[in-house]
UniProtKB/Swiss-Prot annotation:
Keywords: Cytoplasm, Endonuclease, Hydrolase, Manganese, Metal-binding, Nuclease. It comes from Nostoc sp. (strain PCC 7120 / SAG 25.82 / UTEX 2576). InterPro entries: RNase_HII (IPR022898), RNase_HII/HIII (IPR001352), RNase_HII/HIII_dom (IPR024567), RNaseH-like_sf (IPR012337), RNaseH_sf (IPR036397). Manganese or magnesium. Binds 1 divalent metal ion per monomer in the absence of substrate. May bind a second metal ion after substrate binding. GO terms for molecular function: manganese ion binding; RNA binding; RNA-DNA hybrid ribonuclease activity. The keyword Cytoplasm applies. It is found in: Cytoplasm. This is Ribonuclease HII. Endonuclease that specifically degrades the RNA of RNA-DNA hybrids. Its cofactor is Mn(2+); Mg(2+). Belongs to the RNase HII family.
Length: 225
């Protein structure tokens, strides 16, 4: 994994060769990176209800062997109980981790892509220890972060730091939606977590959207019967 630095005036990027198989953190060349590395991922981008949430996680090298055996790839495929268990482990192992989010009002105002990047930026800026490099899930760099960045498509399958961030963001958002579900029981949020399930869409057609639905998303623009 050869590291080559490309620098511009306001945006620093550090491309990493992604040709190696397995976790990036297990590559012998990972030691070429001197300093803290944060993984950044988001959840809730496709939901109809609630905020888009991002997490930034900085893991020590000592955590890598443990997490490599923990099957943390693709948090969406894990059971809720397993995600919660892993989140507790990551919280204990991590040097630092933080949550950032963008509200439904912000999503409607600036669009979901920009809101997602805003949530990511907020999670990074909340870190008490600033990393020298952020591994960003996806193909969009985060603007106005004066640190090195590397975007990685399907990053939660390539980087332990990103996979850990995915789990922390998912558990945090699911917990929030569970609490909000008691206020809006008609939308079946406990089951769908704010996503467009059949019951959720039927409830939107019957009751209309709540103040926490994304009004810029077409399914939320249905007038109630």
């Amino acid at each position: 994994m050869m590291l080559k630095k490309e620098q511009t005036t306001n945006n620093l990027k550090l491309p990493i060769s992604l040709n190696a198989s397995g976790w990036l953190e297990s590559s012998p060349d990972w030691s070429n990176i001197s300093g803290l590395v944060a993984g950044v991922d988001e959840v809730g981008r496709g939901a109809l209800f609630g905020p888009v949430v991002a997490a930034s996680v900085i893991l020590p090298a000592s955590a890598f062997p443990h997490l490599m055996t923990a099957e943390i790839k693709d948090s969406k495929k894990l059971s809720h109980s397993r995600r919660v268990q892993l989140a507790q482990q990551i919280s204990t192992l991590a040097i630092d981790w933080r949550i950032g989010y963008a509200t439904t009002a912000e999503i409607d105002r600036i669009n979901i892509l920009q809101a997602t990047l805003l949530a990511m930026k907020r999670s990074v800026k909340k870190l008490k220890l600033q990393p020298i490099l952020c591994l960003i899930d996806g193909n969009q760099p985060v603007q106005d972060l004066l640190m090195l960045q590397q975007t990685i498509v399907k990053g939660d399958e390539r980087s332990l730091n990103i996979a850990a961030a995915s789990i922390m963001a998912k558990v945090w958002r699911d917990d929030l939606i569970q609490r909000l579900a008691t206020k809006y029981p008609m939308y079946d949020l406990k089951s769908n977590k704010g996503y467009g399930s059949k019951k959720h869409l039927l409830a939107l057609a019957q009751h209309g959207a709540s103040p926490l639905h994304r009004q810029s998303f077409r399914p939320c623009q249905i007038s109630p019967d």
